[in-house]
Amino acid sequence: MITNRAFDDRLHDFEKMYQFLQQEYLVRRDHFVWLFSRLGDWKFSMWNGRKANPEYFSKNAHLWLDTAGELLGFVIDEDGDEIFFILTRHDQIHLYPAMLEWAIEHWRPLYQGLKTEVHEFQVEELACLKQQGFTTPGIAATTRAYDLTSMDKYKAPLPVGFKIVNMVENTDLHARALLSLEGYMEPEKLTDVIIAKLNTSRMSPAYDPRFDLSVVTADGVHVATCVGYVDPGSHVAEIEKVRTYSQYRRLGLAEAVIRECFQRLKASGIKRAYITGYSDGPNALYEKLGPCGHKQWFHYEV
């Protein structure tokens, strides 16, 4: 008998979901829906103010389990808004229609509409969405895969006095936070409380400070960054949080820090890395890095 219930921390549901994604990657490989790193960000990144609600996680994740308590899949709302995701075990795709109906019944009344994200290789899921009246405006994002084992050692040039450091070598959280929040908050409004909220994402089991990289000026200003989230057991990484200070763009800094991340990941035994781009500029950069595979994502709305 298959049962479903709300997320419950007391039942170690995060650990169940994290292991589920690790195991699914070993089967799906480049056709994954979520990687472990995204789940870690959902659970530990406290920048989203909605997460202060004690019921946030139970209201935004719902699990399907078999009689032995094995996780068969889950529905998850990443940010507590109208966008949701459905993840089934590779041999349990037949559960997708029921899980979709659950999401529509419980979450559609909360918002003006619903939106989910699926990739081009989810053929059965795409058919189910269309049957339920979901439509798509087109491509939303592209995930690129990179074979680190065949990647030549190459360091993009940096301006004089600039260097790349990780968060073991440079622990200036204030300078790093200024870069993360550029465009969202005035520098003088940055407080220790806000820095602490940003720092919670580093509690993810996929986080390793060795792969949290920044380009730093001679004056110690963090001007470009990326983070490689890793699963050493699967020899895989996801690179996220690629940012460059607006006044330092067009200097090749994002390319330099990502290429350095590739090399450090490769040296540690990581064989494959993924980066997802949602807009033209980032996608052009990520294509320049020499991907070995592509996967297109679509938003389906109702």
Language-model regions: role of each:
Residues A6-D9, Q22-P109, A218, H222-E240, ...:
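Conserved donor-binding loop and adjoining core beta-sheet/short helix segment
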Residues E78-E82, L87-G161, F298-V302:
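Acyl-donor-binding surface of acyltransferase catalytic domains
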Residues I2-Q19, Y25-H31, K163-A177:
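A short beta-loop-alpha structural element at the N-terminal edge
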Residues I258, S279-P282:
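Short glycine/proline-centered loop/turn elements that form peptide/ligand docking sites
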Residues G73, G138-A140, A224, A254, ...:
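A structural microfeature
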Residues L39, Y154-A237:
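Flexible, substrate/cofactor-facing loop regions flanked by secondary structure
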Residues L114-E117, I239, R272-G277:
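Conserved hydrophobic beta-strand within the GNAT/NAT acetyltransferase core sheet
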Residues Q92-E105, K241-T244, R250-A267, E287-K288:
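Conserved acetyl-CoA-binding loop-helix of GNAT-fold acetyltransferases
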